[in-house]
């Protein structure tokens, strides 16, 4: 039944697109018969990369969309024991599907409104639990078993984007879900206010930030130690200001936090919860004649977060039957962290990236995942090397860790919102955690099949799932189909 609903919804989405977009595109082409050679070439490239025609760059509006389907499975693996939030040791398979409609309208030469509608269906293996670096980034949008989230389409982004010109010179800009502008001032201030994904702006990386074409693992596609403000689906309300000046950029954002860890309801009272995010970016050449980017990230979260050490102390004092991170009075605690994000062009159409992240690890994991420190390194190869210019292949290694306080909490049977091999009825005299760093290796290939249709395999190998040496390793093969509409 669920599969039939997914197919029906997908078909309806594509039918709507054809009815709305193709006539409008035809009208746009008829109204501008004197398109330049450059515009015609760009239109040809666009037709190659998308399933359906798009409006020209000169149009003050933007309409696009995407469909991303990920299938994953894993064979049975060794596990000395399992708990309430464990990744299941028996054979599993699961499919997720995300569809997004991107829209934008330019209301002046410097102001635009962007609005996206999204629909999510399917599921993740083991109800999307048991791995700190979970294998499918798309499942953050999908209601799990027992989730209060609606299965209906939802508003994903709704933001006002204001550009303040500081120079007469322009720079090219890619029209997309974050802007309708084909050009922006080379030196400028940008202000975004509304509903967005924090990592739409912060911790971006052209090699490892897109589960539609690149890596799927949570700790590879994003900085796992960046516990950025977000609701259950990964979105939040906030204001972001950016300053761009050629090689340099600086951005700062004030975001709403959820009322509870990984919750859908946001706390609008800033005296009870809020998050500050800062990032400095410099474009440099770490290698001669090869462009690179270095981004330095910091963030501070203020929310009603529990403290691991207090939860363990209450358990050992007999005040709770097991460590319970949510068993505390209303309080305002602080989590802070830092990150480094590097990408570098290499010879032979290769591009490498690396991330390092750390947070203080004293308070409960709140909005993204249960990682307190991380290191990731990866590489992408462009298909030009084998005469498939639109194809991509990549490999990455991620090593994730948690603080000692976090380890003690899980060892004594405590549960986070994602991991924990303990829980009620699962407590073991010797403890529920034989700690080891969770390590993920991922390989993918994305083949361009036709116009906006892409597909390819993915393979992940996970050591110490949920930071537990008593479980795993796990082999997770997968397959992705993606359509740019």
Predicted feature locations:
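Surface-exposed coil loops of outer-membrane beta-barrel proteins
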Residues: 130-157, 167-275, 279, 324, ...
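Residue-level signature of outer-membrane beta-barrel architecture
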Residues: 69, 105-107, 117, 162-164, ...
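Transmembrane beta-barrel strands of outer-membrane/channel proteins
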Residues: 67-73, 115-119, 191-195, 252-256, ...
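Signature for the C-terminal beta-barrel architecture of outer-membrane proteins
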Residues: 36, 218-342, 349-352, 356-363, ...
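Residues that define the transmembrane beta-barrel architecture of outer-membrane proteins
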Residues: 59, 93-99, 151-156, 233-237, ...
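Short loop/turn motifs that connect adjacent beta-strands in outer-membrane beta-barrel proteins
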Residues: 51-63, 74-76, 104-113, 126, ...
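Outer-membrane beta-barrel "beta-signal"
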Residues: 156-169, 473-485
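Outer membrane beta-barrel transmembrane domains
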Residues: 281, 297-332, 353, 364-462
């Amino acid at each position: 039944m669920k599969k039939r609903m997914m197919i029906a919804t997908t078909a309806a989405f594509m039918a709507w697109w054809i009815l709305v977009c193709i006539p409008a595109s035809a009208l746009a082409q008829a109204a501008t018969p004197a398109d330049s050679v450059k515009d015609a070439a760009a239109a040809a490239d666009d037709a190659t990369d998308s399933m359906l025609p798009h409006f020209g760059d000169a149009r003050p509006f933007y309409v696009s969309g995407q469909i991303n389907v990920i299938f994953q499975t894993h064979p049975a693996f060794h596990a000395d024991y399992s708990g309430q939030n464990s990744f299941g040791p028996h054979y599993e398979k699961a499919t997720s599907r995300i569809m997004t409609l991107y829209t934008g309208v330019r209301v002046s030469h410097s102001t635009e409104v962007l609005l996206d509608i999204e629909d999510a269906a399917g599921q993740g293996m083991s109800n999307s639990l048991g791995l700190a670096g979970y294998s499918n980034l798309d499942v953050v949008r999908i209601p799990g078993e027992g989730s209060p989230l609606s299965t209906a389409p939802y508003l994903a982004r709704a933001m006002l984007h204001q550009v303040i010109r500081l120079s007469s010179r322009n720079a090219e800009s890619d029209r997309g879900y974050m802007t309708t502008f084909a050009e922006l001032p080379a030196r400028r201030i940008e202000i975004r206010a509304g509903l967005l994904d924090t990592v739409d702006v912060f911790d971006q990386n052209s090699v490892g930030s897109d589960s539609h074409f690149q890596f799927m693992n949570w700790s590879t596609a994003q900085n796992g130690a960046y516990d950025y403000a977000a609701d259950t689906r990964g979105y939040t309300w906030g204001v972001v200001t950016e300053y761009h000046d050629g090689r340099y950029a600086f951005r700062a954002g004030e975001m709403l936090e959820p009322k509870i860890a990984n919750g859908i309801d946001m706390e609008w009272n800033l005296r009870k919860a809020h998050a500050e995010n800062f990032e400095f970016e410099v474009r440099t050449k770490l290698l001669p004649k090869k462009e690179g980017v270095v981004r330095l990230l910091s963030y501070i979260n203020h929310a009603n977060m529990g403290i691991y050490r207090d939860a363990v102390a209450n358990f050992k004092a007999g005040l709770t039957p097991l460590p319970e991170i949510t068993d505390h009075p209303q309080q305002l605690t602080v989590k802070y962290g830092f990150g480094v994000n590097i990408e570098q062009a290499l010879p032979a159409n290769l591009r490498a990236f690396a991330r390092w992240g750390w947070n203080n690890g004293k308070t409960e994991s709140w909005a993204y995942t249960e990682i307190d420190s991380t290191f990731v390194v990866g590489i992408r190869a462009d298909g030009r090397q084998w005469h498939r210019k639109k194809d991509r292949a990549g490999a990455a290694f991620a090593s994730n860790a948690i603080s000692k306080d976090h380890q003690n909490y899980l060892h004594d049977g405590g549960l986070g919102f994602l991991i924990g091999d303990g829980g009620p009825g699962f407590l073991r005299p010797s403890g529920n955690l034989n700690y080891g760093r969770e390590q993920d290796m991922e390989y993918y290939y994305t083949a361009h099949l036709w116009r906006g249709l892409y597909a390819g395999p993915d393979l992940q190998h996970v050591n110490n799932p949920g930071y537990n040496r008593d479980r795993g390793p796990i082999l997770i093969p997968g397959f992705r189909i993606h359509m740019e509409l």
